């Protein structure tokens, strides 16, 4: 049985629009060829289901290199958390505990 993904893939324009909102936003900067990114994806889907007041999105760094450079993403996965239009934290690597901690501290 497959689980439907709940983390929506966005482009740079959609990410910028989402960042301007007042909800906590978690963006997963990923690559399709990245093994740790693939293993983290179902965990992020689960977190999205658990935290309905938090917006989860993902951005393919190969398709949106300019956006990845803007946010200084040099390793995948990198998750950046935004609130009220500002970057408030990031986690580099498939560190599920670190991501959960950052969400709980800011939700």
Swiss-Prot record:
InterPro entries named in the record: Thioredoxin (IPR005746), Thioredoxin-like_sf (IPR036249), Thioredoxin_domain (IPR013766)
Cysteines paired by S-S bonds: 34-37
Family: Belongs to the thioredoxin family.
NCBIfam families noted in UniProt: thioredoxin (TIGR01068)
PROSITE patterns: THIOREDOXIN_2
Keyword Disulfide bond: yes
The entry's keywords: Disulfide bond, Electron transport, Redox-active center, Transport
Pfam families assigned to the protein according to its UniProt record, in alphabetical order: Thioredoxin
Record-annotated active site: 34, 37
Transmembrane feature ranges: none
Presence of the UniProt keyword Acyltransferase in the record: no
Gene name of the record: TRX
GO molecular function, one term: protein-disulfide reductase activity
Protein name stated in the entry: Thioredoxin
Site residues, Contributes to redox potential value: 35-36
Task of the protein: Participates in various redox reactions through the reversible oxidation of its active center dithiol to a disulfide and catalyzes dithiol-disulfide exchange reactions.
Ranges for domain Thioredoxin: 2-107
Site (Deprotonates C-terminal active site Cys): 28
